[in-house]
Amino acid sequence: MCIRDRSVKSLVWYSPDNFEDNGYEIPQTMEELVSLTEKMASDGNTPWCIGLGSGGATGWPATDWMEDIMLRTHSPDVYDMWVSNEMPFNDPRVIEAMDVFGSFALNDKYVSGGTKAVATTDFRDSPKGLFTSPPKCMMHRQASFIPAFFPEGTKAGEDVDFFYFPAFSSKDLGRPVLGAGTVLTATNNKPATTEFMKFLMHPEAHERFMGKGGFLTPHTGVDKGKYASDSFRGLHDILTGATTFRFDGSDLMPGAVGAGSFWTGMVDYVNGKSAKDVADAIQASWDAIK
């Protein structure tokens, strides 16, 4: 098995011009991000664009928020127990993380269109608020794939940039990163297959892809200069600088939960259902398939 490509989800996208015009600085901790959110709202700006819409998959963007927050409020071991259901979904620590997400998403002053728009805004349309004049929002938390849905002609590093979704300094949990990856598996043990898999572990193999764009490697031995853009070099620094890396939790859960009750539960949450009731319902769905 060889993991040859990863995506980073622990990102916040923003317009450098909007930040400069308003005197905002990149937050280095979650406490600073919370304070920045409050300041933006008090300045009359809308801090966040959040959209959970995705057709039959509506709700998944909120599961990413939850996973990132779990990694920032509790240890990696707790995250792993949550994902495997060794720790029940309705554990108080999970409910706490959901309410941290709610502190951003359930405040009408913090979200473009107000809380009522969170569940109905398509995730592909959500970041467009960064680029309107005046801007409809100042920040958008989403993975490294989202530039594919930015307005045509948007220049990364100029019109838009990103920063690491920061950790709580008070929690002392380092720099956790949430992501996903492509895993290659050999289906036979032929010599040529074995040699190819070995080759994919070498920096040279990764560097051949890096220059083509759209490829992010976790390999620490590559020459970052081989990336096609500064943006990808920045993503590489976030990825390889992680003190903890965890795969998307919902992707690791049984489909009935991770691509079912977890998605719909987060929609219920932003539509007014309590975190405890949502967590209880998700746990019940997990119990039903055991």
Where are these regions (language model features)?
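Periplasmic solute-binding protein
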Residues: 3-26, 31-34, 45, 51-82, ...
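Conserved C-terminal helix/tail region of periplasmic/extracytoplasmic solute-binding proteins
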Residues: 20, 44, 239-290
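Extracytoplasmic/periplasmic substrate-recognition and gating elements
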Residues: 21-22, 145, 151-216
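A local structural motif
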Residues: 22-25, 105-123, 135-136, 153-159
